[in-house]
Amino acid sequence: MHIAVLGAGSWGTTLAVLLARKGYAVNLWAHRPEFADQLAAERENRRYLNGVRFPDTLRVFTSLHEAVSPADMVVTAVPSQALRETVEQIRDLPMQGRVIVNVAKGIELKTGKRMSEVLLEALPGVRISGVAALYGPSHAEEVSKEQPTTVVASSPSVETANRVQEVFHTSMFRVYTNTDIIGVEIAGSVKNIIAIAAGISDGIGYGDNAKAAIITRGLAEMSRLAVSLGGDPVTVSGLAGIGDLVVTCLSRHSRNRYVGEEIGRGRSLDDVVAHMNMVAEGVFTSKAVYDLSRTKGVEMPITQAVYEMLFEGKPVQQAILDLMTREPKKEVY
């Protein structure tokens, strides 16, 4: 079996290595030719995943067409806001019969579309039954070291979800299946926004009570939005929801939590992002989800607060005061 992995960041590289370790022929595509040449020469990704050697069955490509042409399965691991422009470059390739597995977590800013919707629009011939999302609490730094990890492969097609499960499952990378791709994609997107809020709380110096409140009420926002779009509320209690939410809000590896923490300490968003080595998906997703929540009439006060702090310059302390002094309500999910 041939598998193409599009995106040579930490997560794309990790999955490429995982699949190659299983013996699959893996084509890893890097966006920048000079970076691809470096990966091919050094046989590891020293920029994002230093010390993890590439198996012999992993090849690095600069050409999207060459990477994808022989592939039975295509894994999209580029940033969510770059997904459409990336896959549109291969729209002339026949996609029937291929499984597309997206691992990018976000909502497209300009359209409010989920990642599976973007793939369906950008790739003629692709059907939703051939698209899957692989989400869950899975930091690349741990997966690459073969530390125990559990994720969920979600597709409206049971057959596709099972196929993805079979391909990715290892003794240390346990894959469950799920058919609620709407709930999974919304959960995977919203959790990054809530992680920014959790980081802001850390940066200010608040304690465990505040963090627990953010995670719990953030889960409520995640559930409300998922349900409004046709998702199953049970999904947010699984790996793509509470599982990924907890790890992203608490882990030292979390880019989104780091962005929030630095903002809580007084740094500007532009300054934080300019000095980061990797993409924090929650930044643009906060605007996309805020816009989507307004369109759907879904109350998401934490998401709104993050959006206002990041994009409208609202002072952190004022945003927190506004959150805490809202009209008292029932605890309704």
From Swiss-Prot:
Function per UniProt: Catalyzes the reduction of the glycolytic intermediate dihydroxyacetone phosphate (DHAP) to sn-glycerol 3-phosphate (G3P), the key precursor for phospholipid synthesis.
UniProt keyword Oxidoreductase, yes or no: yes
Pathway the protein acts in: Membrane lipid metabolism; glycerophospholipid metabolism
Protein name as it appears in the record: Glycerol-3-phosphate dehydrogenase [NAD(P)+]
GO term, biological process aspect, one: glycerol-3-phosphate catabolic process
Oxidoreductase keyword on record: yes
Matching SUPFAM superfamilies: 6-phosphogluconate dehydrogenase C-terminal domain-like (SSF48179), NAD(P)-binding Rossmann-fold domains (SSF51735)
Active site: residue positions: 191 (proton acceptor)
GO cellular component: cytosol
GO molecular function annotation: glycerol-3-phosphate dehydrogenase [NAD(P)+] activity; NAD binding
InterPro entries: 6-PGluconate_DH-like_C_sf, 6PGD_dom2, G3P_DH_NAD-dep, G3P_DH_NAD-dep_C, G3P_DH_NAD-dep_N, NAD(P)-bd_dom_sf
EC number: 1.1.1.94
Binding positions for NADPH per the UniProt entry: 10-11, 31-32, 105, 140, 255, 279, 281
Keywords: Cytoplasm, Lipid biosynthesis, Lipid metabolism, NAD, NADP, Nucleotide-binding, Oxidoreductase, Phospholipid biosynthesis, Phospholipid metabolism
Family under the similarity heading: Belongs to the NAD-dependent glycerol-3-phosphate dehydrogenase family.
Species this protein is from: Chlorobium limicola (strain DSM 245 / NBRC 103803 / 6330)
Pfam families in the cross-refs: NAD_Gly3P_dh_C, NAD_Gly3P_dh_N
Lineage top rank: taxon: Bacteria
Residues that, per the record, bind sn-glycerol 3-phosphate: 105, 136, 138, 191, 244, 254-256
